[in-house]
Amino acid sequence: MQRITLEQVFKHHITQKYVNRSGMVHAIAVAYHAFHLAKKHHASVDAATKAGFLHDIGHHTWYTGGEWDYDLYKKNDIHAIKGAERSHKLLIRLGEHPKLAKEISVAILLHTDSFLLEQTLERTPLQNVIKWADEADEEPGGAHHYRTISYEKALKAIQQLDRLVERELQIEQKKLNDKAEHSYQ
């Protein structure tokens, strides 16, 4: 199965519709944070960047008078639930491996405590990475959802992140190959 790239995810019309709604700059920033945190905490950089990029794909438009209503959002939000479902469907349609699509979607589901009644969860390294990456880019009052970027600039940032992920995956594969080679000697 061929790896689905962030560029493929980025270019899909569903991604454009829903990630633009919740903030493309924020999505890209969280994906970059997730990449670096995944390396540090031994999580999959491929899964982390995809989950980081798609983590807010479930946002509803909580607007009042044309402005994002942060209080209304905090009171009624279930974007992590909707985002987990939406991202899973998108990734499967793009041809992502079902196990990886599920892992990414569950990380999206658990990236926030906003809908949880009890906050004592045991998260996996990937789930922690996405939560921390999102928190690293948050701004007071939800201002991180307002930043804008051109399609071209966003695409370049995504392509650069794809190159970083690909390079890291090659390094990981080489380590596995070297380890396997040494075990046969």
Where are the model-predicted features located?
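Divalent metal-dependent phosphate-bond-processing catalytic cores, especially two-metal-ion Mg2+/Mn2+ enzymes
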Residues: 1-3, 18-44, 54, 96, ...
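Active-site flanking loop/helix segments enriched in acidic
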Residues: 4-29, 64-71
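A generic structural signal for nonpolar/aromatic side chains embedded in well-ordered alpha-helices
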Residues: 9-13, 108, 130
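Short, well-structured alpha-helical segments
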Residues: 24, 28-31, 49-50, 101-109
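An active-site-proximal "capping" alpha-helix that borders the catalytic cofactor pocket
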Residues: 30, 37, 77-93
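His-Asp-centered metal-binding catalytic motifs of divalent-metal-dependent phosphohydrolases/nucleases
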Residues: 46-68, 83, 105-113
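A charged helix-plus-loop insertion that forms the helical arch/lid used to bind
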Residues: 67-77, 122
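Internal catalytic-core helix/loop-beta-alpha segment
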Residues: 86-104, 110, 114
